[in-house]
Amino acid sequence: MVRVCRFVDYCSFSLQGEKMKKIAISFSGGRSSAVMTLLVLQKYPDADIQITFANTGFEHEDTLRFVDACDRNLFGGRVVWIEAVINQEPGIGVGFKVVNYETAARDGEPYIAGVRKYGLWNKTNSSCTARLKVEPMQKYLKTKGFVRGKHLNHWTAIGIRADEIDRLSVNRLRDKVVYPLVEAGVNKREVLRQCAKWDFDLRIDEHYGNCVGCFKKSTRKLATIARDTPEYFEKWRMIEEELKDFKKQNNYDPATNFRRIYRKYMTVDDLVQIGSESGFRGFSSAEKDSQGYMFDDFDFETGCGESCEIY
C-alpha cells in the first residue's frame, strides 16, 4: 500500500476536536482518486462515507470500466453513479438520477441537455462542472444527510496529490476539504506504482481522462485525440454546429458570428488540422513527466482534471 503509515498519521487528526465521522468522496474515475478513496475506506471503516461518480456521458469507455472495476475490487460496491437531470423549463434547477455501469449514458446525453439549456460551454461559460457534477452530487448527498452551507456537517476528501499542491483550495478549512494524498506525500509516481499492481488498471493515457473532448484540456492534448481517435469528436462537432448560436456573448467569434468551444475560437476542424500537420508533436504523459518537450501555448490547460473544484 502507498505510504500507509504517513496517511494514518494524517487521518488521525481532528480540527478543533471534530472527528471525521462523515466523509464525502467524489471519485473522478482516475488513478489518484482511486488510491485516495481506498486509503480513506481503509482508515475509516466505521465512518459514514458516501462515494459518488458523476457521469456526463462524454467520459471514455475505459474510465467507466475502471470506475466499475475499482468499485467491485476495492470499494465493496459503494460507488453511487450520478447523472444530471436537466429540465429545460426556465427556473427549474438541476436534478439527479442514480444509474450504474450498464445504464450510464455513453452518448453525451446529460452534457448535450445541459448545453441546450445553459448554452454552449467554453472558457467563458464554464459552468459544466457545476451543472453536471457538483449540483447533482450535492443534491444526492443531501438525501443521505450530508448538508452543505452554514450547517455543513461532513468532510470532503479530494484526490489531489503531493505534486499538485498549487491546486489546493484556499477555502479548504472553511469548506472542510481534506487532501489525504497531499498530507501523505503521495506523488504521481507512487500512484502509478500502486495502480500497476491492479490487473484492472486504466488502459488510457491521461489526455483521455474526464470528458474526452473537454475544452479545458490543452490544445496539444485535444489535437492528439483528434489525430489518433477522430471519432470521439463527432458529437462535439455536432454540438458546435447545432448549438453555436446560444448566448453569443460567451466566447463569441466576431469573424464568424458564432460561439466556439475551444480556445482562440478554434473549432473541431481546427484541432483536426493541427493534429494532422507533419510537424505536430502529440501528447504523451511519459514524455511530459520526463520533460521531453518544452511547454508552450499548446500545453496550457485548466479544468476538471487541473482545477481545485471540490467535486
Give a label for each model feature.
Residues 3-311:
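Nucleotide-activated chemistry modules centered on ATP-dependent adenylation/adenylyltransferase
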